[in-house]
Regions:
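Cytosolic regulatory modules rich in charged/polar residues
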Residues: 1-214
Length: 214
């Protein structure tokens, strides 16, 4: 509900209400657009008598890797693994479709975050691919991403990420309150300006209060 990287799209398929869920940045936009356009052409007579999602999948879903599930836990986990979920009014079960479009870094690894083993990708300048990179590695339904706008002129995107079942709720409320209460015109130095704006001003503490990663 609160994660800004979880997006949904409502359809009317043959007179029946339907909804598609996908994690922003995980789905292939071109594939999902083509499938959505096809579903919108279906008429009521095309879905008359259908009561099972498996029958709908066999007729009108062309993804090679797709399946039906009745388990809500399996459905949620599959969405966070990159699959798209379709639910249609009057059909038992939901369809899971593999239309992944994982983001990948096309430039060099971060100069300040080199690793000897493991992946060499890093954060980029766009917030949606960065959220998808985090979601790709932390496939926990408790991972929540709250989107905020900061800066009365620049309207910079700021995302508050946390595990809902592990986070210190008092600290989370304080951080959220500071983000919502910021009164700045712009973040000229991006994350450095944001950290400077939300952290307490204590001149007598020489140690860093914020860690950065690329």
């Amino acid at each position: 509900g609160r994660s800004c990287d979880m997006v949904s799209r409502d359809y009317l398929i043959g007179g029946r209400r339907a909804r598609l869920w996908v994690v922003d940045g995980f789905g292939s936009d071109s594939i999902l657009e083509r499938m959505g356009a096809f579903w919108l052409t279906l008429k009521p007579e095309n879905v008359v008598g259908l009561t099972e999602m498996q029958d709908f999948l066999d007729r009108y879903i062309t993804f090679s890797e797709s399946n039906v599930t009745f388990d809500i836990s399996d459905a949620v986990t599959s969405v966070f693994l990159g699959k798209s979920l379709l639910a249609v009014e009057g059909l038992a079960g939901v369809a899971l479709m593999d239309a992944k479009g994982y983001p990948s870094r096309s430039v060099h690894e971060p100069p300040d975050g080199k690793v000897l083993r493991g992946s060499h990708d890093g954060f980029v300048e766009a917030v949606v691919p960065n959220m998808a990179l985090l979601r790709r590695r932390i496939r926990d339904p408790h991972l929540t991403m709250e989107g905020h706008k900061v800066g009365s002129r620049t309207h910079n995107d700021a995302v508050l990420c946390y595990l809902d079942d592990r986070v210190d709720q008092d600290l989370l409320r304080k951080l959220r309150g500071k983000l919502l209460g910021l009164d700045v015109r712009s973040l000229s130095m991006a994350q450095e300006s944001l950290a400077e704006a939300i952290r307490p001003k204590q001149w007598y503490n020489p140690f860093p209060k914020v860690r950065y990663t690329e």
